[in-house]
UniProtKB/Swiss-Prot annotation:
Binds DNA as a homodimer. Interacts with MEIS1, MEIS2 and MEIS3. Residues 320-379 bind DNA. Belongs to the Abd-B homeobox family. This is Homeobox protein Hox-A13. Keywords: Developmental protein, DNA-binding, Homeobox, Nucleus, Transcription, Transcription regulation. Sequence-specific, AT-rich binding transcription factor which is part of a developmental regulatory system that provides cells with specific positional identities on the anterior-posterior axis. Gene3D superfamilies: Homeodomain-like.
Length: 386
């Protein structure tokens, strides 16, 4: 089955890829023979036309069919030969066609392919009509067979004739090819190279690429063999980083404090405390920053009023508590004397002992609690031993 598909990748110009599915060996061999026969017939017609033009004899029947114009007949024969060669070895060229334009031609593998004479006649008629139209200055009448043959056998002519539209980029311009020109089939030797004349390759290079850099060497080295493979869309002009909608791709906003200051953003802030900040480069997103950058207290700061936290003294803290300092003998003597008088201290006595021993009221209260617990343990131990 022969298929001609126009793909629409994400390129500047649409690219045409011609795929040939080798349904059976006999059909493929017969098609090749027909193409060779068409090329031979076209070459014979060209030779006859040239002989008739040079020797002054009677024109060839192909020339007579073209209206006695020997140049038209020669052009038709040459076009038929080129069309046969192009139909046999098609390569993928970026054709500046309309995005919606697509053409598909198929022939079932079981059907008999057209004969060589019919193919040559159709190609010659199409080329003769085109030459007559160009010589007369107007669009000459073209039959359906000629248009069909022109569309089917001249895929590369669209790229060569599009001088008004933007020039498409060739293979190797972005570091990767467009599409492979290969014959797909079950046989291992199904992939064949697409050979074209050096003049056509040079004209294509002069028109569609800059031949001043290393790309020219690559193109010239591949002018005779274009059996390359498509490397994917990795090097395409549209294959760049595109941010996913709903996500913001930008670096972290630096802190508003000093270089050594740590930021602790409070959790659960309402959206009213944020104001939108327009982003550069035209991104369709907004970043929200708090209006007031508050500095909450450190988590390890003690809740006691008499404890002062210092970052330099962090090693002396344990879970936010001050390191235990044993009481002096003078302090213990004053506390023991008051405990012997009364095991439960009053508010006035607590203030007096705090002022005398240079201890806080909380420390005095805790000492009395611990002293009662200690005495209780001692009494319980004596009871158990006795």
């Amino acid at each position: 089955m022969t298929a001609s598909v126009l793909l629409h990748p994400r390129w500047i110009e649409p690219t045409v890829m011609f795929l040939y599915d080798n349904g059976g060996g006999l059909v493929a061999d017969e098609l090749n023979k027909n193409m060779e026969g068409a090329a031979a017939a076209a070459a014979a017609a060209a030779a006859a036309a040239a002989a008739g033009a040079g020797g002054g004899g009677f024109p060839h029947p192909a020339a007579a069919a073209a209206g006695g114009n020997f140049s038209v007949a020669a052009a038709a024969a040459a076009a038929a030969a080129a069309a046969a060669n192009q139909c046999r070895n098609l390569m993928a060229h970026p054709a500046p066609l309309a995005p919606g334009a697509a053409a598909a031609y198929s022939s079932a593998p079981g059907e008999a392919p057209p004969s060589a004479a019919a193919a040559a006649a159709a190609a010659a008629a199409a080329a003769a009509a085109a030459a007559a139209a160009s010589s007369s200055g107007g669009p000459g009448p073209a039959g359906p067979a000629g248009a069909e043959a022109a569309k089917q056998c001249s895929p590369c002519s669209a790229a060569a004739q599009s001088s008004s539209g933007p020039a498409a980029l060739p293979y190797g311009y972005f570091g990767s090819g467009y599409y492979p020109c290969a014959r797909m089939g079950p046989h291992p030797n199904a992939i064949k190279s697409c050979a074209q004349p050096a003049s056509a390759a040079a004209a294509f290079a002069d028109k569609y690429m800059d031949t001043a850099g290393p790309a020219a060497e690559e193109f010239s080295s591949r002018a005779k063999e274009f059996a390359f493979y498509h490397q994917g869309y990795a090097a395409g002009p549209y294959h760049h980083h595109q941010p996913v909608p709903g996500y913001l791709d930008m670096p972290v906003v630096p802190g508003l404090g000093g270089p050594g200051e740590s930021r602790h953003e409070p959790l659960g802030l309402p959206m009213e405390s944020y104001q939108p900040w327009a982003l550069p480069n035209g991104w369709n997103g907004q970043m929200y920053c708090p209006k007031e950058q508050t500095q909450p207290p450190h988590l390890w700061k003690s809740t006691l009023p008499d404890v002062v936290s210092h970052p330099s003294d962090a090693s002396s803290y344990r879970r936010g508590r001050k390191k235990r300092v044993p009481y002096t003998k003078v302090q213990l003597k004053e506390l023991e004397r008051e405990y012997a008088t009364n095991k439960f201290i009053t508010k006035d006595k607590r203030r007096r002992i705090s002022a005398t021993t240079n201890l806080s009221e909380r420390q005095v209260t805790i000492w009395f609690q611990n002293r009662r617990v200690k005495e209780k343990k001692v009494i319980n131990k004596l009871k158990t031993t006795s």
